[in-house]
From Swiss-Prot:
TM spans (from-to): 4-24, 30-50
Any one cellular-component term (Gene Ontology): plasma membrane
Entry annotated with the keyword Cell membrane: yes
Localization terms from the record: Cell membrane
Keywords, sorted A to Z: Cell membrane, Membrane, Transmembrane, Transmembrane helix
Top-rank taxon: Bacteria
Bilayer disposition of the protein: Multi-pass membrane protein
Protein's UniProt name: UPF0391 membrane protein RPC_3278
Provenance organism: Rhodopseudomonas palustris (strain BisB18)
Family note: Belongs to the UPF0391 family.
Length: 57
């Protein structure tokens, strides 16, 4: 449990530095880009997984 506390402390410190440091706007844009890339990769992998599942029968 102590490991989780340390992990969340580090995440909170990084978020505070980014939020109060003035680069929050750039971080938001990067997060949006990464989010949409992750959604596209998820959809591609889901379609490929479904296509492979049908051919194995």
């Amino acid at each position: 449990m102590l490991g989780w506390v340390i992990t969340f402390l580090v995440v909170a410190l990084i978020a505070g530095i980014l939020g109060f440091g003035g680069i929050a706007g750039a971080s938001i844009e990067i997060a949006k880009i990464i989010f949409f890339i992750a959604v596209v990769l998820f959809l591609v992998s889901a379609v490929v997984g479904l296509a492979r599942g049908r051919n194995r029968v």
